[in-house]
Amino acid sequence: MAKKNTRNTKGKIISAAWKLFYDQGYDDTTVDEIVEESGTSKGSFYHYFDGKDALLSSLSFLFDEKYEELKETLQGDDSAIDQLIYLNQELFLMIENSISVDLLARLFSSQLITRGDRHLLDQDRTYYKLLRKILQEGQQKGELRRDLSINEIIKTYAMLERGLMYDWCLCNGDYSLAQYAKRVLPMMLAVYKDCDA
């Protein structure tokens, strides 16, 4: 039960912070405003985070909350590739609608220069567990190639998604991330289809 409360408190802080970052900008958001918006205390904030900068690496937590919500809506009779495209579309729409390009760029920057954990690569994240489940089922159903390991497919798929987000940041959000991914992702994922299926 303590773990659930910990996740709830930390999650409230993260959700409030990213909402404020989006609404008023990262630089114009204070720790006091985050604490007030989250309905938590300053002590709780500093229990989980060294400061506001530490929240930059928490975006993966927000992504995983979205994946937790989405995994309940996945259709088991859809192909593995269709499920990946669905998850991608929903996450990229969330990014477009609630995370500024500047904040996403800061996340990538913080992950590149950190000496600590690189949360985006954490294999214990909901994201990686969900990918593994979808891809294993896809291989078992004969939808996906068997000459590639699940780990290889996960690594290249995650790299592809990060690359799409990174390019979107480089282009300063000049195009729809979700629409572009909707067009290119099926072509890129076709390489994983079992040609005999």
Which residue ranges define each predicted feature?
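Hydrophobic alpha-helical connector segments
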Residues: 58, 72-98, 150, 154-157, ...
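Short coil/turn segments at alpha/beta junctions that flank glycine-rich nucleotide-binding fingerprints
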Residues: 23-27, 77, 98, 141, ...
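Amphipathic alpha-helical segments used for helix-helix packing
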Residues: 95-115
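Short hydrophobic/aromatic patch on the recognition helix
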Residues: 39-49
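Basic, helix-initiating cap at the start of DNA-binding domains
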Residues: 1-24, 28-40, 54
